[in-house]
Curated annotation (Swiss-Prot):
Short name of any one Pfam family annotated for the protein: FGGY_N
Keywords, sorted A to Z: Allosteric enzyme, ATP-binding, Glycerol metabolism, Kinase, Metal-binding, Nucleotide-binding, Transferase, Zinc
Function: Key enzyme in the regulation of glycerol uptake and metabolism. Catalyzes the phosphorylation of glycerol to yield sn-glycerol 3-phosphate.
EC number: 2.7.1.30
Protein's organism: Shigella boydii serotype 18 (strain CDC 3083-94 / BS512)
BP-aspect Gene Ontology terms: glycerol catabolic process; glycerol metabolic process; glycerol-3-phosphate metabolic process
PANTHER family in alphabetical order: GLYCEROL KINASE, SUGAR KINASE
Transmembrane segments: none
Associated pathway: Polyol metabolism; glycerol degradation via glycerol kinase pathway; sn-glycerol 3-phosphate from glycerol: step 1/1
Binding of glycerol, residues: 84-85, 136, 246-247
Protein name per UniProt: Glycerol kinase
Keyword Manganese: no
Amino acid sequence: MTEKKYIVALDQGTTSSRAVVMDHDANIISVSQREFEQIYPKPGWVEHDPMEIWATQSSTLVEVLAKADISSDQIAAIGITNQRETTIVWEKETGKPIYNAIVWQCRRTAEICEHLKRDGLEDYIRSNTGLVIDPYFSGTKVKWILDHVEGSRERARRGELLFGTVDTWLIWKMTQGRVHVTDYTNASRTMLFNIHTLGWDDKMLEVLDIPREMLPEVRRSSEVYGQTNIGGKGGTRIPISGIAGDQQAALFGQLCVKEGMAKNTYGTGCFMLMNTGEKAVKSENGLLTTIACGPTGEVNYALEGAVFMAGASIQWLRDEMKLINDAYDSEYFATKVQNTNGVYVVPAFTGLGAPYWDPYARGAIFGLTRGVNANHIIRATLESIAYQTRDVLEAMQADSGIRLHALRVDGGAVANNFLMQFQSDILGTRVERPEVREVTALGAAYLAGLAVGFWQNLDELQEKAVIEREFRPGIETTERNYRYAGWKKAVKRAMAWEKHDE
């Protein structure tokens, strides 16, 4: 029998599908990535084609093995991590989606959310699901699809339609429709799941009129869910044995499995999570209470703050504003000036996430004077990512009562040394950048490997968490507070912009 030497992590993100092969020492052997189309039918609406998600993800799996020149029978297990909240409804018989995937960033369900608020459900939802009422989460998206695709609610009741987040969709496709599951971390993002009883919440299903028949079974983040054939029928059968939403996977990949440990991921958005152990801390400061993974993939809780626009604001500088040619340019131009010349950019293109939760905020640039040039705006856009992170960290420390001593960071933007240094400056906290940047994939690989005994426990993995560089604060407290006060003022003015004046 061939020795099982590798784990594959599938990392299905918002803009691309990736596959990563890792060996027993958690070294990355090969990576394959394919981008797919972002669909914007109306302002504020965002969709993906679920078949394209599947096509890009399945082709990266084949590609990554070919690139590494390894055969599928050397793979011990597959772990899956995914963009969370994105919602897919498909036909059980044919496997065909009845509508495009409604993406986490999509704001089309703002009105449904207003109704939930008017019906006085905020406290119930916060207490039982850990979430705030916002279009971000899957529940209102499922309702929207069932409301708008004729006959779909009746079909769902008859058991003809299935709902899933992206992890569920991928596993369903990989197992030829044999397995309809999700894990606790993804379920905790739907607004349909009770994070205390660890079951689907009857009241939420009733309120949103979502038939229970269409929901997946919820399982631990580290166990064998089913097998997939690589290379079609008769190919090698490989266990799929790890699932976690991207942010929880990154938390696990950073080995933040003890209470009080935190990480910030700088991707399309920014996501900060702090592990709170076995205690679900209810936030009084606009954060989410969510499910994370303990040392063996069991249920832990975490506080989470989501910033919607991080890397996406750099893409805006590149694609819409044409101020830079690629993301790497942003650091070069930002360091061409000493400061932002009084400019603040509030990148609230799709509203504001934690701790404000204002779907009606819109992007704005404040403090423009005649001397402001493109470099100042580029620098201010980068700084906005760090300011938003501080907003979240302040809320997190207030809720948890824990003063953070170091923030572990990951995601594409951490390669930007200017941003990481400014992040440390504005937080007044050490920022630790790990050597392995692929921590989301790492988390999925760890969860999958632990389930099949590829690794015995997390102690084996501790020495792999090498910090490549540590950034320390380099500005005075008064300067830090002065700059942050300017940011708060700018945010205040960008809020409620889209609300029509009565």
